Amino acid sequence: MDTFQVIILALIQGLTEFLPISSSAHLILPAQLLGWEDQGLSFDVAVNTGSLFAVVIYFRNELWAMFKAWIASMVKGQHSDDSKLAWWIILATLPAVFFGFIAKDFIETHLRSAGVIAVTTIVFGLLLWWADKMSRRDLTVYQTGWRKALLIGFAQALALIPGTSRSGATMTAALMLGLSRDAAARFSFLMSVPVSLGAAILVGKDLAESPLPIDYQALTLGTVISFVAAYLCIHYFLKIISRMGMTPFVIYRLILGAVLCGFIFL
């Protein structure tokens, strides 16, 4: 890949990973518009790692408090709001892990098409709008509970379907279950840590076994750009939804889905 391609793809990954607008829908557009080939496994690992670093550093205080409380709950039997939240995040991760293992090959073979991505971008955009407008939105992140956490986890598993958007699906489910916009976003972001870490380890294992050469300069640049873009995205997204809700992202998804349909059918 040349430098321009690295910059564009890393920006797309960083900006779309945590917005409810589907990163896979955006990554398919450069290929459609510019005829770019697949960026490769090593680049995927690099930009995903950059996004992971961004959410870990942004929520470092919350994650550290949760980790300490989680350890205390196991060692000393001391339970607090932070320890409960940590357990809920772990519980919410399990459905994606389970369905990821059993459905990965089917999804890669049958669902990674532009048509599927276009449809899911539109359908789940409408579901996000409905959830944002019709739900009560008054629960904090510490009022999630294990049942709601598990249901949000199943929504995350559903997001294995390309175009759905992991953050979009989890925020939609959280809003439907009564969480506030801020709580839904924060729970979704915190959920991304174990999932992204697990995915990076699995893909990194495949990369280590690959005989293909590695362009370390491109990977470093991609990681840094993805990190900066994702960090800024998280910061400003939390500000936007507190003022405007999810409507701007719903409108964007509908337009994006229509554009993808245009590429497919015209």
From Swiss-Prot:
Record bears the keyword Hydrolase:
yes
Q: What class of enzyme is it?
A: hydrolase
**Topology with regard to the membrane?**
Multi-pass membrane protein
Q: Name one GO biological process term.
A: regulation of cell shape
Q: Name one GO cellular component term.
A: plasma membrane
EC number(s): the record gives: 3.6.1.27
Catalysed conversion reaction:
di-trans,octa-cis-undecaprenyl diphosphate + H2O = di-trans,octa-cis-undecaprenyl phosphate + phosphate + H(+)
Q: Where in the cell is it found?
A: Cell inner membrane
- Report the GO molecular function annotations: undecaprenyl-diphosphatase activity
This protein's major location comes to membrane
Keywords from the named record: Antibiotic resistance, Cell inner membrane, Cell membrane, Cell shape, Cell wall biogenesis/degradation, Hydrolase, Membrane, Peptidoglycan synthesis, Transmembrane, Transmembrane helix
Q: Which residues cross the membrane?
A: 1-21, 39-59, 87-107, 111-131, 149-169, 183-203, 218-238, 246-266
Q: Which InterPro entries match?
A: UppP
Relate the protein's function as given in its record.
Catalyzes the dephosphorylation of undecaprenyl diphosphate (UPP). Confers resistance to bacitracin.
HAMAP family named among the record's database cross-references: Undec_diphosphatase
Q: What else is known?
A: Bacitracin is thought to be involved in the inhibition of peptidoglycan synthesis by sequestering undecaprenyl diphosphate, thereby reducing the pool of lipid carrier available.
UniProt-listed PANTHER family:
UNDECAPRENYL-DIPHOSPHATASE
Name used for this protein in its record: Undecaprenyl-diphosphatase
The species this protein belongs to is: Shewanella sp. (strain MR-7)
Query: Which gene does this sequence derive from?
Result: uppP
